[in-house]
């Protein structure tokens, strides 16, 4: 077979290293530099001619820099005659801009999809897209993995006496119900009203949480305002404990302070984005082995269906 290579950008090299270690191959070499005016310059340091290549690069903050770096690396690999170029994007930035939510606004997620394809990506592997329909913005294969596989095993290992799943808002009900069904648990809903971007107001609880160990489920944690306020309300309604599960730890603004000083007992996240700092309340689970297994199967033309269960 042609052989494959794993490259990583500068956004999360540790994640790329984990993938390479799982696969038993070294990370391939690429040099990322910046000119004095800030322009990104990339040089692929080894031959990729005829090879299948996988680029690991979450488009987290600084989002524009990391996205541009990914696009330039794709272009460099295309011009170096790689056989296929697979963009491994653990966290897909701009996914919240998936539709026209107001007059005269862009659909930036579609623009990013177009840019990736135009640059030369032949496949995208990502996790827990904020809006699943973004897969339809692409004309190339998109594997949207579920972080719930890793979170499910963690929840089981805690042996909580009286667990129940909660959605932090109406929009996340489908995601939370899927997770609840996987574990055979009941579901409650936190009904909230969002006053403006990144500011959330929790209203009431739909369901009974008295004496329950509540597990809040969401795809990303941005300012942590939703989760912090939800935890307060849940405990005021009699919840024994509140754990939050969020695939992508964006953690902007005062997120760390809200987690550390708030009512949440634990915040469990995946390592799709590197953390800015550690906290005794934050538990990080690695999803790198899951991505690595998908890469292995894609290269060997094996089905990845079982990894979505």
Curated annotation (Swiss-Prot):
Subcellular localization: Cytoplasm
PANTHER family: RIBOSE-PHOSPHATE DIPHOSPHOKINASE FAMILY MEMBER (PTHR10210), RIBOSE-PHOSPHATE PYROPHOSPHOKINASE 1, CHLOROPLASTIC (PTHR10210:SF41)
Binding site for Mg(2+) 2: 169
The protein's Enzyme Commission number: 2.7.6.1
Protein known as: Ribose-phosphate pyrophosphokinase
Task performed by this protein: Involved in the biosynthesis of the central metabolite phospho-alpha-D-ribosyl-1-pyrophosphate (PRPP) via the transfer of pyrophosphoryl group from ATP to 1-hydroxyl of ribose-5-phosphate (Rib-5-P).
Alphabetical list of InterPro entries matching this protein: PRib_PP_synth_CS, Pribosyltran_N, PRibTrfase_dom, PRTase-like, Rib-P_diPkinase, Rib-P_diPkinase_bac
Record: active site: 192
Chief localisation class: cytoplasm
One GO molecular-function entry: magnesium ion binding
GO biological process: 5-phosphoribose 1-diphosphate biosynthetic process; purine nucleotide biosynthetic process; ribonucleoside monophosphate biosynthetic process
Subunit structure: Homohexamer.
Assigned protein family: Belongs to the ribose-phosphate pyrophosphokinase family. Class I subfamily.
Organism the protein comes from: Wolinella succinogenes (strain ATCC 29543 / DSM 1740 / CCUG 13145 / JCM 31913 / LMG 7466 / NCTC 11488 / FDC 602W)
The protein's annotated pathway: Metabolic intermediate biosynthesis; 5-phospho-alpha-D-ribose 1-diphosphate biosynthesis; 5-phospho-alpha-D-ribose 1-diphosphate from D-ribose 5-phosphate (route I): step 1/1
Cofactor, how bound (note): Binds 2 Mg(2+) ions per subunit.
CDD domains: PRTases_typeI (cd06223)
């Amino acid at each position: 077979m042609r052989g494959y290579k794993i490259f990583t950008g500068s956004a999360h090299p540790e994640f790329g290293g984990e993938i390479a270690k799982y696969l038993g191959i070294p990370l391939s070499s690429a040099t990322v530099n910046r000119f004095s005016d800030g322009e990104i310059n990339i040089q692929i340091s080894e031959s990729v001619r005829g090879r299948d290549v996988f680029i690991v690069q979450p488009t987290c903050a600084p989002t524009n820099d990391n996205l541009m770096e990914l696009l330039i690396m794709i272009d460099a690999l295309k011009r170096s005659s790689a056989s296929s170029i697979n963009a491994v994007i653990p966290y897909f930035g701009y996914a919240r801009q998936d539709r026209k939510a107001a007059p005269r606004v862009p659909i930036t997620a579609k623009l990013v999809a177009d840019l990736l394809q135009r640059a030369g990506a032949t496949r995208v592997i990502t996790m827990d897209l904020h809006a699943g329909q973004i897969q339809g913005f692409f004309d190339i294969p998109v594997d949207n993995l579920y972080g719930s596989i890793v979170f499910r095993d963690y929840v089981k290992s805690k042996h909580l006496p009286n667990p129940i799943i909660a959605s932090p808002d109406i929009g996340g009900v489908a995601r939370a119900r899927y997770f609840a069904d996987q574990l055979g648990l009941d579901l409650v809903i936190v009904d909230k009203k969002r006053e403006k971007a990144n500011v959330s107001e929790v209203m009431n609880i739909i369901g009974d949480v008295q004496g329950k160990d509540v597990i809040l489920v969401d795809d990303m944690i941005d300012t942590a305002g939703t989760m912090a306020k939800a935890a307060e309300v849940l405990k005021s309604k009699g919840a024994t404990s509140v754990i939050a599960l969020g695939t992508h730890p964006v953690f902007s603004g005062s997120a760390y302070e809200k987690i550390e000083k708030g009512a949440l007992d634990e915040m469990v996240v995946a390592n799709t984005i590197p953390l800015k700092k550690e906290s005794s309340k934050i538990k990080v689970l690695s999803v790198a082995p899951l991505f690595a297994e998908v890469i292995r199967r894609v290269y060997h033309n094996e089905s990845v269906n079982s990894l979505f269960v």
